[in-house]
């Protein structure tokens, strides 16, 4: 049995629609799950949450929903309650708090918490990348370049650090035009 071009077109269209439907449904389930978790945490209330891990999870959901001021409050409370947590958890919470501040263009505060994250876990390339990005936003190009170089020592294949350090290298080595006499006339 031979398929006409119209039948082939319909089959291909049907397969494409099924694939798109699967992706849309998966995204719907993911978003619904996040929304339900957010509602669950909001119903509990910030005051009833005392575990740093719960607070981190709540703050992460708030970041995904771009509720940065609320996430800052949540992460600050997590920091108050994380004395018994491992250094890795402390670093992740401090990095998330720094990210929340950076998202609101409060880069000096962000740098403070990125440095706390790095103090807890010195070989944490994500916090180092975020620190360098905040330094770059504050026009501290030499510091940002040095920080990206630290990232590259830890992770030579880090795409963000490679790209940003090349950009900063061009910016740092840039020499403005000095006039006609230097042109050779």
PLM ranges: what are they?
Residues 52, 86-87, 91, 125-126, ...:
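Helix-start (N-cap) detector for alpha-helical repeat units in TPR-like alpha-solenoids
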Residues 1-53, 60, 67:
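Long, contiguous interaction/recruitment modules in multidomain scaffold/adaptor proteins
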Residues 55-58, 62, 74, 93-101, ...:
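TPR/Sel1-like alpha-solenoid repeat signature
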Residues 64, 103, 137-138, 167-171:
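Register position in tetratricopeptide repeats
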Residues 3-18, 153, 157-185:
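Terminal, low-structured helical/coil segments at or just beyond the last alpha-helical repeat
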Residues 44, 78, 116-117, 150-151:
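Canonical positions in the second alpha-helix
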């Amino acid at each position: 049995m031979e398929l006409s071009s119209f039948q082939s077109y319909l089959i291909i269209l049907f397969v494409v629609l099924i694939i798109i439907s699967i992706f849309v449904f998966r995204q719907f389930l993911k978003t619904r799950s996040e929304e339900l978790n957010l509602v669950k945490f909001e119903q509990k209330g910030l005051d009833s949450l005392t575990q740093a891990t719960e607070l981190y999870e709540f703050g992460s959901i708030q970041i995904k929903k771009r509720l940065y001021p609320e996430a800052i409050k949540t992460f600050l409370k997590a920091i108050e309650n994380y004395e018994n947590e491992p250094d890795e958890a402390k670093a992740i919470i401090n990095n998330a708090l720094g990210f929340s501040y950076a998202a609101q263009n409060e880069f000096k505060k962000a740098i403070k918490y990125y440095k706390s994250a790095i103090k807890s876990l010195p070989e944490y390339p994500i916090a180092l990348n975020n620190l360098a990005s905040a330094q770059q936003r504050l026009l501290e190009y030499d510091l940002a370049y040095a920080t990206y170089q630290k990232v590259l020592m830890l992770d030579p294949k880090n795409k963000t650090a490679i790209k940003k350090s090349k950009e900063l290298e061009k910016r740092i080595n840039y020499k403005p035009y000095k006039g006609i006499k230097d042109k050779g006339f």
